[in-house]
Amino acid sequence: MAFLKKSLFLVLFLGLVSLSVCEEEKRENEDEEEQEDDEQSEEKRALWKTIIKGAGKMIGSLAKNLLGSQAQPESEQ
């Protein structure tokens, strides 16, 4: 009976250890995924910032050209 008890305790102990290791690996994987998500978010933010900046410059130059072309006929009259 004592042998059975020791065997049962050994099996339970090994099961808990393996469960603990699996949970630790799972946490590490989740942390890595979060870091990848953060990096992707930063890249998207930088991309949008660049796109908006470029669009702003284009709109500004377009408005300047339109206003400039409207001002020229008035000065000729």
Curated annotation (Swiss-Prot):
Residues 1-22 form the signal peptide. Residues 23-43, 76-77 form a propeptide. GO terms for biological process: defense response to bacterium. It is found in: Secreted. Expressed by the skin glands. The keyword rRNA-binding does not apply. Its main location: secreted. InterPro entries: Frog_antimicrobial_propeptide (IPR004275), FSAP (IPR016322). Keywords: Amphibian defense peptide, Antibiotic, Antimicrobial, Cleavage on pair of basic residues, Secreted, Signal. It comes from the Eukaryota. Pfam families: FSAP_sig_propep (PF03032). Belongs to the frog skin active peptide (FSAP) family. Dermaseptin subfamily. Has antimicrobial activity. Exhibits a bactericidal activity towards several species of mollicutes, firmicutes and gracilicutes. This peptide is membranotropic and it efficiently depolarizes the plasma membrane. This is Dermaseptin-B9. The gene is DRG3.
